[in-house]
UniProtKB/Swiss-Prot annotation:
Belongs to the class-II aminoacyl-tRNA synthetase family. ProS type 3 subfamily. It comes from Ureaplasma urealyticum serovar 10 (strain ATCC 33699 / Western). Keywords: Aminoacyl-tRNA synthetase, ATP-binding, Cytoplasm, Ligase, Nucleotide-binding, Protein biosynthesis. GO terms for cellular component: aminoacyl-tRNA synthetase multienzyme complex; cytoplasm. It catalyses: tRNA(Pro) + L-proline + ATP = L-prolyl-tRNA(Pro) + AMP + diphosphate. This is Proline--tRNA ligase. The keyword Transmembrane helix does not apply. SMART domains: ProRS-C_1.
Length: 472
């Protein structure tokens, strides 16, 4: 077993402190003097770049083009859409002064960019021939969060926001669902995080949306994390910002809109779904180092460097890290465990005498002696095995933790066991708030299922099978 660094707190001791110690020890985040504003260190940014590259590739398959919007929005523009301004007003960072000049119309630092995209679309769309228009930007946004935690609630966070306009409601709504499917496929197949797809309740929708589609993931402590959302915005923004096109009937019509986003919050999900008490466990597809080549006292055995170079050349298709320092092998392994490297290759004199190296799997800690001639094929197979194993482990926990309930008492019991519940629910926002007071759980999403039953809270007949959980 590799050396365990003392600074990592175990999950059983305190899950929140464990999370923070993982973030710190894996060199993901550095705090600054401004609450909620954090440095994304190279390890974290490499994960985000891998996420960004794959999502961007998928978006392009659906005709989405990237652009960049300004950071500032005149406050007067926010006030054109009542629901939107009410939804974001408490979170706005404001620019009230430039130099020594006070502004009559202050600027808001974008918390999201619907308004910017609306003004852009208004200026470029004329007729139905211009539609659809699908754009995305990768940027940071700022929201004044009362309580901040790395990745989960940053005052400034990085994300992508996709905005698109269409001639019809059907097209816009279907594209919102398509993008949710893109997120679902990516999060499950690349990040190895099983998710639950569903529709947000009206009171949990994005401000100004008619529908909000979501994917919810379960963390190891039983809490849900909203991992990505896609919204059908209807014509609310189009009417507020006068986005019209000339239809085939030669009449002017308002466009139908959608938007969608996935943020660096997903890195928090990666940690809380996969990591253990030794550190990160990163899926091979997005690990910043997929393989670490660790020589054992190469300073005393120079031939190990020659073999390590041969291994590096043979595995050049992978993201590699090498450590040939005189640090002990236990320390080297512990550092790679913390940083979540899927496979470590130990290059030592004893093994090389038999033309072998030792592979150490991060997910199971298993050590495997491998002949050098079989190294490349074994690595390929192991990376696939690791990917499958960490997904199946998370999927098993999710499946075993969703319990159907018929009463508020059953819901209390399930939530107290750090599980999630599903129940037929046809209550109101006020009912949901009361349930949260009683159980600490709230509605996360409505399942996309056609069955019906009796609401566990109001006794009404309903087809809304709903997920309840504590949530981040």
């Amino acid at each position: 077993m590799a050396k365990k660094l003392e600074k990592i707190i175990t999950r059983n001791e305190n899950f929140a402190d464990w999370y923070t110690s993982i973030v710190n020890n894996a060199k993901l985040i550095q705090y600054t003097d401004i609450k909620g504003m954090m440095v994304f260190q190279p390890n974290a940014w490499a994960i985000w770049e891998a996420i960004k590259n794959q999502i961007d590739l998928e978006f392009k398959k659906h005709g989405v083009r990237n652009l960049a919007m300004p950071t500032l929005i005149p406050l007067s523009e926010f006030q054109k859409e009542k629901d939107h301004i009410e939804g974001f007003a408490p979170e706005l960072f404001m620019v009230n002064q430039i130099g020594d000049k006070k502004l009559d119309n202050p600027y808001a630092i974008r918390p999201t960019s619907e308004i910017l995209f609306c003004n852009y679309f208004k200026n470029i769309v004329n007729s139905y021939n211009d539609l659809p228009i699908k754009n995305n930007q990768w940027c940071s946004v700022m929201r004044a969060e009362k309580t901040t935690r790395p990745f989960l609630r940053n005052a400034e966070f990085h994300w992508q926001e996709l905005h698109a306009i269409f001639a019809s409601e059907h097209e816009a709504d279907e594209f919102a669902k398509t993008i949710l499917d893109v997120y679902t496929d990516f999060v499950q197949n690349y990040l190895c995080i099983p998710v639950i797809k569903g529709l947000k309740t009206p009171w949990e929708r994005f401000a100004g949306a008619q529908k909000t589609y979501t994917i919810e993931a379960m963390m190891q402590d039983g809490q849900a994390l909203q991992s990505a959302t896609s919204h059908y915005l209807g014509q609310f923004f189009a009417k507020a910002y006068d986005i019209k096109f000339q239809g085939q009937d030669n009449q002017m019509h308002y466009v139908h809109q959608m938007s969608a986003g996935l943020s660096t919050r997903i890195i928090g999900a990666l940690i809380m779904v996969h990591a253990d008490d030794q550190g990160l466990i990163l899926p091979p597809d997005i690990a910043f180092n997929q393989i670490a080549i660790l020589s054992i006292f190469a300073n005393k055995n120079p031939q190990l460097l020659t073999i390590s170079e041969q291994i590096r050349n043979e595995l050049s298709d992978y993201r590699l890290f090498e450590d040939h320092s005189d640090k002990g092998v236990g320390y080297k392994l512990a550092q790679q465990e913390i940083e979540g490297t899927p496979i470590c290759i130990l290059v030592g004199v004893k093994e090389l005498a038999n033309q072998q190296v030792v592979l150490v799997r991060r997910d199971t800690h298993e050590k495997i002696n491998v002949n050098l001639i079989d190294l490349k094929s074994t690595i390929k197979k192991l990376l696939l095995d690791i990917k499958t194993n960490i997904y199946q482990k998370a999927k098993k926990q999710l499946d075993e933790s969703i319990v159907f309930v018929n009463s508020i008492e059953e819901l209390k019991q399930v939530i107290a066991q750090n599980k999630m519940a599903k129940a037929f629910f046809d209550g109101s926002k006020e009912d949901d708030e009361q349930i949260k007071l009683l159980t600490n759980a709230s509605t996360r999403c409505i399942f996309d299922e056609t069955q019906s039953g009796q609401c566990f809270y109001t006794n009404k007949k309903t087809n809304k099978l709903t997920l309840f959980a504590r949530a981040y």
